[in-house]
Curated annotation (Swiss-Prot):
Species of provenance: Homo sapiens
Summary of activators and inhibitors of this protein: TRIB1 competes with substrates for RFWD2 binding.
Name of the protein in question: E3 ubiquitin-protein ligase COP1
Motif window: Nuclear localization signal 1: 109-113
Motif Nuclear export signal: where in chain: 235-245
Induction / repression: By p53/TP53.
Keyword hit for DNA damage: no
Motif Nuclear localization signal 2 positions after renumbering to this chain: 195-206
Pfam family, one: WD40
An annotated GO BP: response to ionizing radiation
Site note Interaction with TRIB1, residues: K472, Y491
Catalysed transformations (reactions): S-ubiquitinyl-[E2 ubiquitin-conjugating enzyme]-L-cysteine + [acceptor protein]-L-lysine = [E2 ubiquitin-conjugating enzyme]-L-cysteine + N(6)-ubiquitinyl-[acceptor protein]-L-lysine
Domain of life from the UniProt record: Eukaryota
């Protein structure tokens, strides 16, 4: 490129059109030297046809000349000048002033030669969407490799280079260009031209591919018409355009209709496949139901059941809106049964059956889901089928066993009527469930004897022993081996070992840097206990040592800690990172499992069994986990818990937790919905006697089961933020 730009620096006298220029110059000189010149005007026009330019004038000036890109300006006497520089918008050269100063006519009686049409309309087949701003004034085509002169005009590089070799003036304004090297690339124009070409190619591509090959020629003509002036279209052209547009419209409508039918067909096929899968599933479930019904009928023949009383309300299946369709004839009275013939049967059987049917109706969807999840998990041999059916029968029996919650006794943790806060934070039974301890924000631990509380006819109960701490108490835990050994944690981060019957302190641990939320004794190792704190540490303590024996870095505030009931080495704790962490104490560097699923901080983590953990969070959910699986087995919803510690306890089958609507909620571990609830009465103090019951912000804050050695556990104790403690029984 540099070599081509530097090659040649010829002047105007050596241009390819020097002969034509000299003839015009001589004619002008002769006219100016005549004393009385005739009235003659010189006009030059370059006609673009076949690459030949001709100049004509009166008096025989000029003949056939070589085609030139730019002719130099010729000056004559009288200030007249003839210029054949091609304009931006015209194919013809502008006529110059002739003798006598006339610049527009050849004489008073001469005819005017009409100017040609503008560029784009003057070119044949110029349907391209050209812009005059991008047309080279020399070659009348789209600029290729735009270069700019000092005067600011842009041309094709080849065109301006060749023009300047012939003449050192700008073809647009006759500005003198001293050196051919004084050309500069116009990057902006090049970029705009490139975009213009891309738009044109996209437009051409769409039009070329929108019709079939049979109509390609007609659409090519249609494209040509789009680039022409509207005034040049006649009626035949317009009719043809309308015909093409109508054809295109019909084609698009047909394609649209075909697409709609295709979508409809796909929807119908997917719906049919889903329904077939559902039908297959229903058929499998029906076969399982028929099999189990026969098995239960065979088992019923081995017993002599008490006949049903006709006065007992029959079980009514939920409506189809509850996703349960049950044949009503299955629950109709057997033939020959009458109320009079059965009135002498056991009344307890009738009442029990009626209450269980009521609970079955209320929770039919959950029970149905539980049944099929149990039975359809693995369909194998008869022994496996029998065990699955027995498993569901046990689940159904436990779910329908209890109908209500009955209060047995009421206690008060509040010290006086004017005490503003009496929140009970923890309740725990001792090893033999003979005594229970209550602790909370009043900084006191009160120990009561269970039998005394239950047997007293009065509502005022006094503790067997009372211990006072230096700070608010967050948690307490009884030793499973030493009946009198009790541990407590408080808001100062202190862990204290007490003699629960004498009230004496045996150990004080003060290694936590922040508030300690939880403490728990190891059920298998009576000397080991653990505590969790806001300092993101879980510390392990030994009752015969003054310092901690190990520490686990949790990287988040620890809200609860609990040992496994079946292993001395396994520990679970919940954190503010929304997770439950499960550790083996033989390797405290990393957890065995991290259970993720809660949306907020985990406030409690309790073992339901040696393999199952239930966790509570301030996202108003309980979640059941298996220690060997990272996913949640079941979520329990119904209670409200968004900011407070509301308590959590389990006896192996049932889970109890508090709620921020001042109620106690009970769940069965096999079903997600609430089993039973118990509402605490709002006890107003002297200062709150004018406040409405709905305005209270009381919540159940602690709960504990009374687990008997034989495994039966239908008694629990719950307390709320007012300091009211209820001993409750499931009936």
């Amino acid at each position: 490129m540099s070599g081509s730009r530097q090659a040649g620096s010829g002047s105007a006298g050596t241009s390819p059109g020097s002969s034509a220029a000299s003839s015009v110059t001589s004619a002008s000189s002769s006219l100016s030297s005549s004393p009385s010149p005739p009235s003659v005007a010189v006009s030059a026009a370059a006609l673009v046809s076949g690459g030949v330019a001709q100049a004509a004038g009166s008096g025989g000036l000029g003949g056939p000349v070589r085609p030139v890109l730019v002719a130099p300006a010729v000056s004559g006497s009288g200030g007249g000048a003839v210029s054949t520089g091609l304009s931006r918008h015209s194919c013809a050269a502008r006529p110059s002033a002739g003798v006598g100063g006339s610049s527009s006519s050849l004489g008073s009686g001469s005819r005017k030669r009409p100017l040609l049409a503008p560029l784009c309309n003057g070119l044949i087949n110029s349907y391209e969407d050209k812009s005059n701003d991008f047309v080279c004034p020399i070659c009348f085509d789209m600029i290729e490799e735009a270069y700019m002169t000092k005067c600011g005009h842009s041309f094709c590089y080849k065109c301006i280079h060749q023009s300047l070799e012939d003449n050192n003036r700008c073809p647009k304004c006759n500005y003198v260009v001293d050196n051919i090297d004084h050309l500069y690339p116009n990057f902006l124009v090049n970029e705009l031209i490139l975009k213009q070409k891309q738009r044109f190619e996209e437009k051409r591509f769409k039009l070329d591919h929108s019709v079939s090959s049979t109509n390609g020629h007609r659409w090519q003509i249609f494209q040509d018409w789009l680039g022409t002036d509207q005034d040049n279209l006649d009626l035949a052209n317009v009719n043809l355009m309308l015909e093409l547009l109508v054809q295109k419209k019909k084609q698009l409508e047909a394609e649209s209709h075909a697409a709609q039918l295709q979508i409809l067909m796909e929807f119908l096929k997917v719906a049919r496949r889903n329904k077939r899968e559902q039908l297959e599933q229903i058929q499998k479930e029906l076969s399982v139901l028929e099999e189990d019904i026969k098995r239960v009928e065979e088992m019923s023949g081995l017993y002599s059941p008490v006949s049903e009383d006709s006065t007992v309300p029959q079980f009514e299946a939920p409506s189809p809106s509850h996703s349960s369709i049950i044949d009503s004839t299955e629950y109709s009275q057997p033939p020959g049964f009458s109320g009079s013939s059965q009135t002498k049967k056991q009344p307890w059987y009738n009442s029990t059956l009626a209450s269980r049917r009521k609970r079955l109706t209320a929770h039919f969807e959950d029970l149905e889901q539980c049944y099929f999840s149990t039975r359809m998990s693995r369909i194998s041999d008869d022994s496996r089928t029998a065990s699955q059916l027995d498993e569901f029968q046990e689940c159904l029996s436990k779910f329908t066993r209890y109908n209500s919650v009955r209060p047995l006794a009421t206690l008060s943790y509040a010290s006086d009527l004017y005490n503003g806060s009496s929140i009970v934070s923890s309740i725990e039974f001792d090893r033999d469930c003979d005594y229970f301890a209550i602790a909370g924000v009043t900084k006191k631990i009160k120990v009561y004897e269970y039998d005394t509380v239950i047997q007293d006819a009065v509502d005022i109960h006094y503790p067997e022993n009372e211990m006072t701490c230096n700070s608010k108490i967050s948690c307490i835990s009884w030793s499973s081996y030493h009946k009198n050994l009790l541990a407590s944690s408080d808001y100062e981060g202190t862990v204290i070992l007490w003699d629960g019957f004498t009230g004496q302190r045996s150990k004080v641990y003060q290694e936590h840097e922040k508030r300690c939320w939880s403490v728990d004794f190891n059920l298998m190792d009576p000397k080991l206990l653990a505590s969790g704190s806001d300092d993101a540490k879980v510390k392990l303590w030994s009752t015969n040592l003054d310092n901690s024996v190990a520490s686990i870095e949790a990287k988040a505030n620890v809200c609860c800690v609990k040992f496994s009931p079946s292993s001395r080495y396994h520990l679970a704790f919940g954190c503010a990172d929304h997770c439950v962490h499960y550790y083996d104490l033989r390797n405290t560097k990393q957890p065995i499992m991290v259970f993720k699923g809660h949306r907020k901080a985990v406030s409690y983590a309790k073992f339901v069994s040696g393999e199952e953990i239930v966790s509570a969070s301030t996202d108003s959910q309980l979640k059941l986990w298996n220690v060997g699986k990272p996913y949640c087995l079941r979520s329990f919803k119904g209670h409200i818990n968004e900011k407070n510690f509301v308590g959590l306890a389990s006896n192996g089958d049932y889970i109890a937790c508090g709620s921020e609507n001042n109620s106690l909620y009970l769940y069965y571990k096999g079903l997600s919905k609430t089993l039973l609830t118990f509402k605490f009465d709002t006890v107003k103090s002297v200062l709150d006697k004018d406040r409405k019951e709905d305005d209270t912000n009381e919540f159940v804050s602690a709960v504990c089961w009374r687990a008997l050695p034989d495994g039966e556990s239908n008694v629990l104790i719950a307390a709320n933020s007012q300091g009211t403690i209820k001993v409750l029984e499931l009936v």
